A protein has these predicted regions:
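Solvent-exposed loop segments that connect transmembrane elements
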Residues: 1-3, 48-84, 124-165, 205-210, ...
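Structural signature of Gram-negative outer-membrane beta-barrels, strongest in the C-terminal barrel
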Residues: 10-12, 22-25, 29, 33-35, ...
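Gram-negative outer-membrane beta-barrel transporters
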Residues: 108, 120, 241-243, 265-360, ...
Length: 440
């Protein structure tokens, strides 16, 4: 198993100033955003082993500390210090933007909303671009290894120091939405948005992008559909296309069947085509139902990575056209609630997540699952509110998320892992929580 320890301090300041004015059928806004964000962050990583049982126990193993000049074997519970993607960055980013919007009622039935935003972006950050390895840390030091032929201990000097990276860029965004009411209750709507940005300070916490990898991220969105409204139903159905270019991600690649892992920096694209239908239903006084259904197909584009392990073995992963891991293709939300009185409310929440892939190459997956919640909220008076929440009241069991160390496993190899224990995240168990809020 792997554990990351994070330490960070964030300071930020945000202010918005806006002017608005109506001119005939136009509702105009003109504004300025100023946002300052300072980050001082670092993390470290380690690995450990535990028994597989109801109450797992930490296990001891034999390991060699690469910082030990004698390379003596030690009996330890943790090992592989900072082998896997420890992070560090310190610096700030500042965004100063001018934006405008216009809500234009062209005719009583036809509405056009459009706007734009231009942002000056400045970033100053410390970056450590050196590849990570066991015993990695800031400073001047040696690591030690043993020559396989002679048995001699070899000292390798390292000098790990952060370097300052400063960027000054312009980002932009634009949006256009058109709505046409065919009747008082039924209408059509379509909108498009494009937004851009450059890599942010947090993306320099790992090895960070090189100058060649520092590219503009572009996010276009196009959607269209229809809506229907009356006094008890608000129904919307939309088809959406969205993509994102030049994503930056650190991926930990583990050699299958071993504990050895390497971290690589990836730059790739994602695109999604989906259909979403949502409804807000109020059939009688006090009762409300929110319902949503989504079918989507998020896929990787230009996703290729390769890694060389300590024994010289080279392995690669090609996720082009694969479904994005951890993202289900089918989503369902059902949220009924009932106000017994104006101060007493009962509610339930059902979330269905369809089949979800647990690794990059669609080799391992989790079956669909329901996550359920329910509760009661009581506003006793203007000073006191009480609540009770039940989590997972259907007592669903299983795993979700990803499976550590599985990224290089292919569909052809997946059968080799049938019946094996693999680590991941578990569904939150049946839980009852009570809360109280006091206002003065």
């Amino acid at each position: 198993n792997r554990t990351w320890l994070h330490v960070g301090k964030v300071k930020n300041f945000l202010v918005t100033s806006e002017l608005s004015k109506r001119f005939g059928t136009h509702d105009l806004r003109l504004g300025v955003n100023e946002w300052y964000y300072h980050l001082d962050y670092h993390s470290s990583s380690l690995q450990w082993m535990a028994s597989v049982q109801e109450y797992p126990q930490l296990l001891h193993s034999t390991a060699v500390d690469p910082l030990d000049p004698t390379l003596s074997s030690q009996r330890v519970q943790t090992y592989g210090y900072n082998e896997l993607s420890p992070e560090y960055t310190k610096g700030y980013e500042n965004k100063l933007a001018l934006y405008f919007t216009d809500n234009w009622q062209v005719t009583p039935r036809f509405n056009v909303y459009y706007g734009g935003r231009l942002e000056y972006y400045r970033m100053s950050a410390d970056q450590i671009s050196a590849s990570r390895f066991p015993g990695f840390h800031i400073g001047d030091f040696n690591t030690y290894s043993k020559d396989e032929e002679t048995g001699n201990i070899i000292a390798t000097p390292h000098s790990i120091q952060p370097a300052k990276v400063v960027k000054n860029k312009l980002n932009y965004a634009a949006t256009l939405r058109m709505t046409y009411n065919m009747t008082k209750q039924f209408g059509l709507t379509a909108d498009g948005t494009v937004a851009t940005r450059f890599p942010r300070i947090n993306e320099y916490a790992g090895t960070g992008p090189t100058e060649e990898q520092y590219k503009r991220v572009t996010i276009p969105l196009i959607r269209g559909g229809l809506f229907y409204k009356n006094n008890w139903l608000n129904l919307t159905s939309m088809v959406t296309y969205i993509s994102k270019s030049n994503n930056i991600d650190q991926q930990n690649l583990t050699k299958p069947g071993t504990k050895e892992g390497k971290t690589v920096l990836l730059i790739y694209n994602i695109q999604t085509l989906g259909w979403t239908t949502s409804a807000e239903i109020d059939p009688f006084k006090g009762f409300h139902l929110h319902a949503l259904f989504t079918y989507q197909k998020p896929v990787y584009k230009n996703y290729n990575a390769s890694v060389t392990f300590d024994d010289g073995a080279q392995m690669s992963v090609n996720a082009n056209g694969m479904i994005v891991k951890e993202i289900p293709q089918v989503l369902v939300e059902l949220d009924p609630s009932y106000n017994i009185t104006k101060d007493l409310r009962l509610w339930l929440s059902f979330r269905y997540f369809g089949k979800t892939y647990a690794n990059l190459q669609e080799a391992l997956y989790f079956n669909g699952r329901w996550e359920t919640f329910g509760g009661i909220n009581w506003n006793v008076n203007k000073h006191l509110s009480l609540g009770a929440t039940v989590i997972n009241f259907l007592n669903q069991k299983g795993a979700s998320g990803t499976i550590n160390g599985s990224e290089l496993i292919t569909k052809e190899e997946a059968g080799n892992y049938a019946g094996r224990y693999m680590s991941g995240n578990y569904l939150r168990p049946f839980t009852v929580e009570f809360s109280a809020g006091i206002k003065f």
